[in-house]
Structure formats: C-alpha cells, structure tokens
Amino acid sequence: MVISHFVNRVRLLLPLLLVFAGLGCNGGKGASSAAASSAPQQDAQPSPSQPPHYGEPAEPAKHVDAERAMQYTREIVAIGPRWDGSPGQQRVGAYIHDKLKNDQVEEDAFVAETPAGKIPMRNIVAKFPGDKDGIIVLGSHIDTNYPLRKTRYVGANDGACTTALLLALADQLRGKKLPGYSVWLAFFDGEEAIKEWSDSDSLYGSRHLAAKWQQDGTIRKIKGLLLADMIGDADLDIIRDQRSTPWLEDLVYEAASRLGYKSYFFADTDEIIDDHAPFASQGVPVADLIDYTYGYNNAYHHTTEDTLNKLSVKSLRISGDVILEAIRLLDVNADRLAASPRASK
C-alpha cells in the first residue's frame, strides 16, 4: 500500500499489493482491509444497476465562459505562490473580493493552530439567492502547498484553476434570482497540510466552515456540495470518489452524459480525503470532482511542473458546464434522491 503523506489528499493505491494478492501472498494485511476498496478500478460502473429517473428542469442549460475562466487562472497564477501566511495568500483573497465586489460576500476569518504556529486564514463565501428554500454549495481551495513555499510552485491546476472556475461560474449566476436553490460559492483556505497530512494538519478552512455552519443551522439547508479540485488538466479524467455520496455522484454522471462528456468522468474509482470530507461527516451530500491523474502517475501534482501549459480551456468548459447542469438537476431532484435507497449506500 502506498499512502503519500506529502500530498494534500490521501490517495490509497494498492497496485503492488493486488498483484501479490493474486499470487497468493498474504503479507501486509494490517492496513489492506481498510484500504482495498480504494485501489483504482478499471471500467468502473458509475451508475446504479437501475438508474434513477431524473425530473426535467424547466430552465435552459447555462454554459460557463471557459476562456474567461482560463484568463482568471492566468491572473491567479501571476500572483505567485499562495501558501498560508504569505503575501500571495492575502493577494488572492483580495483578488476574489474584487471579482465578487457586486455580490453578497461574507468572510469566515479565523486563526489556525498549525505545526508552524498560529496562522491567520479566511474562507470567502459568495451567496446567490434562489427561489427555493435550500442551498447548493460549490467549493474550491485557494491556497498552495506550504512545504513547497521556497520554490516557485504556483499550483496552476491545484488551486488556481478551480478558484478561477468558481469565479467564472459566478458570472453565470449573478444578475437575477436563481430559479431553484440558492447557490453559494465557498473559497476554502488552508486545504493544504502545513507539515504533514493528518486529521489535524489539513483542511483547516473547510473544517472551520463546516463547524460554523453546523452551529448556526446552515448545514441542514444544504442540498448538495460539489467540490472542484484539479480539474483544469488538459488530459481530463475525473475519478469517482468512493468517499462522496453515491446518489450525488450518479447525478453528476447524468449531467456529464447529457452534455456528451461522460467519457471524461468516472472511468476509475478511488478514495479521496478533500475539502468535502468535513461536510460529509455532518451528513451533507457531497461530490468531489477531482482529476487525480495529473501527468503520468500523477507526476505533476505538488511539483513546480504544475503550470499553466498543462491546462486547457476545454477541460474548464467540460468541468464548468457539468457543474451548471448538475445544479439544474439538483434543483428538481435533490429531495427525492436524498430519500431514495441509493442515499443510504
């Protein structure tokens, strides 16, 4: 079993163990039973054997301006490294505020206790009101890897492009009251570990915001949380995350299928711990939309090779349009699907 503690998500891969298991080897069983389900599965079946019937949204589909999303990505990358406690962290927060200056925006500021001491952090939440009682949350993290702070690591795919994508989605959401649920954009700070990934050294922003929303009752109003992470990769391959809510992942796959993009979704499965996890533990339906094959064997992730030339406008268009279609489907299907037998799996 390979568990990388230096990365910002725990990817549990067992290719060698599975080979030895096939040869009858019984070594290393201490951790294998807990992690075996996370090994990549080829030809995964993303939908249940009896796919649900989805109600049809009345409103026409919207489309993200992917060229604008790429321009926002360039501007965020130009800020430079954005690790927590850095000037770049402050600048990216100011950049987000500037892009959302005419919207309803709230800050969730806090001081995180980290292995490097106390570090000020802030989540930024933009709220777009809807006609229905309920909230759909779209999330992305805004920080870059802390251990790489002395390099020119800029996190083009890991942090920049999904922050940019949310800003481009905001351009589609603003203007008039939404016909369905309210949509909130959550820009999470402190996703990356400061020293080494652990329950206490990671996901600082999402853990803080989930706790706050649990305390004030917001959690109970959330119909679904769609997290975007590392999905600007030109070679797009979004995995099916086994820690996400099955019915919501099914709905995302339905959205992709309707748009002709299903070949980019869920060919493989894996278990990912990411900013959706604190909300899942509170009972929120979650889906982590993440491409964890960034370069051969994920070679570009958390390296200075995570640069703009690895991204594509097409991938941002696919990801953004599928998220918008998923919002449309959630507007008319969320309550019924959450009460279905699939929701208990």
What do the PLM-derived regions correspond to, one by one?
Residues 46-93, 296-307:
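N-terminal capping segment at the start of a domain
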Residues 153-255, 263, 268-271, 275-276:
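Acidic/histidine-rich catalytic neighborhood of metal-dependent amide-processing enzymes
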Residues 26-29:
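Bacterial signal peptide processing site
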Residues 56-63, 77-87, 110-115, 149-160, ...:
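Second-shell loop/turn segments in exported
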Residues 71-131:
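A non-catalytic alpha/beta surface segment that caps or lines the substrate-entry region
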Residues 2-14:
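Bacterial N-terminal signal peptides that target proteins for export
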Residues 21-24:
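C-terminal motif of bacterial Sec signal peptides marking the signal peptidase cleavage site
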Residues 52, 60-63, 109-113, 224, ...:
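Active-site-adjacent substrate-binding region
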